[in-house]
């Protein structure tokens, strides 16, 4: 890849909820849009209107009233490759406005993903988009890079899936990675449910987006859940108003902290899983006894679902209760954690030492999609 020096690599973080894309070396993604493909529910009757058979991202969101919205990524795994291809096409041509055959591309994926997933990604990049080179990196590892560390445990929680990934000197420890299929989308669904108990009805895919906005603007994590519940019964200090698109104003109280509490008590949504604090602890306990101290001192939060205020204090409190009493515990919540996977990718792809890591088109032509397991780890 002699000619790679003058061409900026593309970094594309394909999340379950949002695609973050941009150029390596930038400090933030240029394009952030929903990972959604919408298809018309009705046939077009207006002659001369150029109706498309599919809309991607923000355009799909704005026309959501007449479309069926589908997310091609579920729980971090691509479930619909045709739609995924549309999203990538949209990213390259409409959002970044580049020719994919001219730029190396760094993609991200969730840990513990099926092997076929990254093979298919590789195949599409080289065969459909003619990329000159590509690489697939693990999301949580990139978040750690972005925080300036090489050792630590990352709790990465997005829209579709949460993970705890212990990393030592830059290597993730696969035997200790734990995955929790509980994330932002489940919190939105739970908030829809508990708002219904208050008498507000939210049912359609379009209304779900409104509830997601309520969640993002008003929710917080209680440091002491029981105590907050008691307070909210007697006082209205916690209540906030939210104006719906049609002008109606709704009031939301204890729901503000009941919603993210699911992360710590998954039984609220009928899941028999451990909460994020316990999953983090279990993940640390699966690691070698000598490195646990370094992990306890570097617990890094990443992803949009860790954006709730109060989450770092609560994490710290819960893990302190589980860990040995003399252990020093530090939970780091970087302010840019919503995009830290992308930022880590931007850092990685612009390192001079990384340039020999790319899988080139020539290597792919020789070895096939399986090469991705040999070169990306």
Swiss-Prot record:
One of its GO terms (molecular function) is structural constituent of cytoskeleton. It catalyses: ATP + H2O = ADP + phosphate + H(+). Belongs to the actin family. This is Actin-2. Its main location: cytoplasm. Pfam families: Actin (PF00022). It is found in: Cytoplasm, Cytoskeleton. There are 8 actin genes in A.thaliana. Keywords: Acetylation, ATP-binding, Cytoplasm, Cytoskeleton, Hydrolase, Nucleotide-binding. Subject to negative translational control in pollen. GO terms for biological process: response to cytokinin; response to far red light; response to high light intensity; response to red light; root epidermal cell differentiation; root hair cell tip growth; root hair elongation. One of its GO terms (cellular component) is cytoplasm. Actins are highly conserved proteins that are involved in various types of cell motility and are ubiquitously expressed in all eukaryotic cells. Essential component of cell cytoskeleton; plays an important role in cytoplasmic streaming, cell shape determination, cell division, organelle movement and extension growth. This is considered as one of the vegetative actins. SUPFAM superfamilies: Actin-like ATPase domain (SSF53067). It comes from Arabidopsis thaliana (Mouse-ear cress).
